[in-house]
């Protein structure tokens, strides 16, 4: 264990919470101390759900450890059933409660509760949140789903979307639209908005559409084995992947692969005038494996970007990410340490980051534009509007999301370049007022002060700005370098000056460093 200010994944019982919160008629009884009771905060503040998560805690205290904590669990479990009357109950322990080894599953089985009670064995000190969600959904499906007659019409189950997922709500609607265009019905969507009764009907579908392997691949494999239902392997994120997804579903279900491309604008926009100064931009990708794999191919094949680094935080998918990295001829970063991610991004010096909420913070620190492509995300990535990532509309949304940081970044660079111009400096009036604009002050014509938005300082103290003095002329010239490579230029210049034994960086030093590293 280690102390950190950020984690990409919580303990596995958080994954179980996400499944329980996504479903209806299911209740989660969690054996946990007071400090582990944060589900309400996760789902009502961040995801802005209009109801509290169906989680009941035993909330034992330190003084209870010398008494019967197992008895506390049994009382809590019975009270939860009496109050909420769920169709099924899942029981488990938090990472802290796991240490006292009360066996919530075994205790619940002795209580004669008249609904299915599904025990969860989630090893908190070996696995993490995505494993918890995958294992929880698998145990629910294993306990409730059975083989049955197929529906008369061709139908599929959509499995994988859950609470706190990145655009899961909107992705469901987009995937449904793709299926309806081919005349394929939807039998059950699970776990999102499904009840335990719905889970018992999973076996009636002809196939399963697996939206997010992180959360439902174990369940999909189980249904394939027990119910004879094949499942899709293609994730429809991006134009090419959506075409492949439609073809795969059509083949599994034996229907014609019909497509309505009238809503698709991304290919035209990516070929438009805007793209002439976006092609070849260097991007770094990090997030969950599903979204990183999709984003890497979109970046290279549909946007014309150059992928300079990629990685994921969920080690269960490390092998596939390493294979992808070999395809792109870049190193694979498999880590859940945000400091390692920041170091890799700083070393790669990309022009844009595609990542999670943490990469958004890293981008701000390093002065690099960032677009969010993967959970974990904060409240701004649970929009009220329709904003999918999958399907045709998802391709449009992705184009806007990725391009706008670059466009606005270029605009910001132009503004900073011309800030000292006699016509555009901060104290000049609106340019369309002509001769009525006030004259620039002497200070505005010769600004010596440094902008408040400082460039990120490098980590290495021997080459950092704490031992180097930048003269005003060199500082002003440095600001003319685009912000997305300015940090690298600063570091190279300071390293060059340190190698030359210089304590001050003049305009000549800057030019000499540029010539040195251009060789």
Curated annotation (Swiss-Prot):
Residues given in the record as substrate binding sites:
409-410
InterPro entries listed in its UniProt record: ChlB/BchB/BchZ, LI-POR_suB-like_C, Nase/OxRdtase_comp1, P-CP_red_C, Protochl_reductB, Protochlorophyllide_Rdtase
Q: Which reaction does it catalyse?
A: chlorophyllide a + oxidized 2[4Fe-4S]-[ferredoxin] + 2 ADP + 2 phosphate = protochlorophyllide a + reduced 2[4Fe-4S]-[ferredoxin] + 2 ATP + 2 H2O
Sites where the protein binds [4Fe-4S] cluster: 36
Q: Where is this region: Disordered?
A: 426-465
Q: Which domain of life is it from?
A: Bacteria
Output the Gene3D superfamilies linked to this UniProt entry.
Answer: 1.20.89.20, Nitrogenase molybdenum iron protein domain, Proto-chlorophyllide reductase 57 kD subunit B
Active site feature: 274
- Keyword Methyltransferase in the entry? The reply is no
- Which Pfam family, just one, is annotated for this protein? PCP_red
**What detail does the entry give on cofactor binding?**
Binds 1 [4Fe-4S] cluster per heterodimer. The cluster is bound at the heterodimer interface by residues from both subunits.
Catalytic class of the enzyme = oxidoreductase
Q: What is its EC number?
A: 1.3.7.7
Q: Which UniProt keywords apply?
A: 4Fe-4S, ATP-binding, Bacteriochlorophyll biosynthesis, Chlorophyll biosynthesis, Iron, Iron-sulfur, Metal-binding, Nucleotide-binding, Oxidoreductase, Photosynthesis
GO biological process annotation, one example: light-independent bacteriochlorophyll biosynthetic process
Cofactor(s) demanded:
[4Fe-4S] cluster
Pathway in which this enzyme or protein is active? Porphyrin-containing compound metabolism; bacteriochlorophyll biosynthesis (light-independent)
Q: Where is the composition biased (Basic and acidic residues)?
A: 445-456
Record keyword 4Fe-4S present: yes
GO MF terms on file? 4 iron, 4 sulfur cluster binding; ATP binding; metal ion binding; oxidoreductase activity, acting on iron-sulfur proteins as donors; oxidoreductase activity, acting on the CH-CH group of donors, iron-sulfur protein as acceptor
UniProt lists the family membership as follows:
Belongs to the ChlB/BchB/BchZ family.
Task: Describe the task this protein carries out.
Answer: Component of the dark-operative protochlorophyllide reductase (DPOR) that uses Mg-ATP and reduced ferredoxin to reduce ring D of protochlorophyllide (Pchlide) to form chlorophyllide a (Chlide). This reaction is light-independent. The NB-protein (BchN-BchB) is the catalytic component of the complex.
Q: Subunit structure of this entry?
A: Protochlorophyllide reductase is composed of three subunits; BchL, BchN and BchB. Forms a heterotetramer of two BchB and two BchN subunits.
Q: What is the name of the protein in this document?
A: Light-independent protochlorophyllide reductase subunit B
Gene source species: Jannaschia sp. (strain CCS1)
């Amino acid at each position: 264990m280690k102390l950190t200010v950020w984690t990409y994944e919580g303990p596995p019982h958080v994954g179980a919470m996400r499944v329980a919160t996504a479903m209806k008629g299911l209740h989660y009884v969690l054996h946990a101390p007071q400090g582990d009771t944060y589900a309400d905060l996760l789902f009502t503040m961040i995801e802005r759900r209009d109801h509290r998560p169906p989680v009941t805690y035993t909330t034992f205290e330190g003084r209870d450890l010398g008494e019967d904590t197992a008895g506390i669990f049994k009382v809590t479990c019975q009270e939860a059933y009496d109050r909420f009357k769920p169709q099924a109950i899942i029981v488990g322990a938090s990472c802290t409660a796991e240490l006292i080894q009360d066996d919530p599953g075994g205790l619940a089985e002795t209580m004669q509760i008249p609904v299915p009670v599904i025990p969860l064995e989630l090893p908190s000190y070996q696995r993490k949140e995505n494993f918890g969600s995958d294992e929880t959904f698998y145990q629910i499906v294993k306990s409730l789903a059975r083989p049955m007659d197929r529906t008369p019409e061709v139908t599929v189950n959509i499995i994988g979307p859950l609470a706190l997922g990145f655009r899961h709500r909107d992705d469901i609607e987009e995937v449904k639209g793709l299926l309806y265009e081919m005349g394929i019905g939807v039998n059950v969507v699970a776990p999102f908005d499904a009840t335990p009764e719905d889970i018992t009907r999973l076996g009636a579908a002809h196939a399963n559409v697996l939206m997010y392997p992180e959360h439902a691949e174990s369940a999909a494999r189980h249904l394939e084995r027990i119910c004879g239902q094949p499942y899709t392997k293609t994730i429809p994120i991006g134009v090419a992947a959506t075409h492949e997804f439609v073809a795969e579903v059509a083949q599994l279900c034996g229907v014609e692969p019909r497509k309505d491309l009238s809503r698709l604008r991304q290919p035209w926009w990516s070929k438009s005038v805007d793209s002439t100064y976006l092609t070849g931009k260097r991007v770094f990708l990090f997030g969950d494996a599903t979204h990183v794999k999709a984003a890497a191919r979109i970046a290279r094949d549909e946007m014309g970007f150059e992928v300079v680094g990629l990685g994921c935080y969920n080690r269960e998918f490390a092998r596939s990410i390493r294979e992808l990295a070999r395809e792109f001829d870049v190193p694979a970063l498999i880590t859940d340490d945000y400091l390692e991610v920041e170091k890799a991004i700083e070393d790669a010096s990309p022009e844009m980051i595609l990542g999670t909420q943490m990469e958004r913070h890293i981008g701000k620190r390093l002065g690099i534009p960032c677009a969010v492509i993967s959970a974990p995300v904060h409240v701004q990535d649970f929009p009220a509007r329709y904003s999918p990532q999958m399907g045709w509309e998802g391709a449009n949304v992705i184009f806007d999301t990725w391009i706008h940081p670059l466009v606005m970044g270029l605009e910001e660079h132009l503004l900073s370049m011309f800030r000292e111009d006699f016509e555009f400096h901060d104290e000049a009036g609106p340019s369309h007022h002509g001769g009525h604009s006030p004259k620039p002050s002497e200070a505005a014509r010769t600004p010596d002060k440094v902008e408040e938005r400082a460039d990120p300082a490098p980590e290495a103290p021997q080459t950092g700005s704490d031992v180097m003095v930048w003269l005003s002329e060199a500082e002003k010239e440095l600001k003319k370098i685009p912000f997305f490579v300015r940090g690298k230029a600063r570091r190279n210049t300071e390293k060059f000056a340190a190698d030359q034994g210089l304590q001050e960086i003049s305009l000549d030093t800057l030019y000499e460093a540029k010539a040195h590293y251009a060789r």
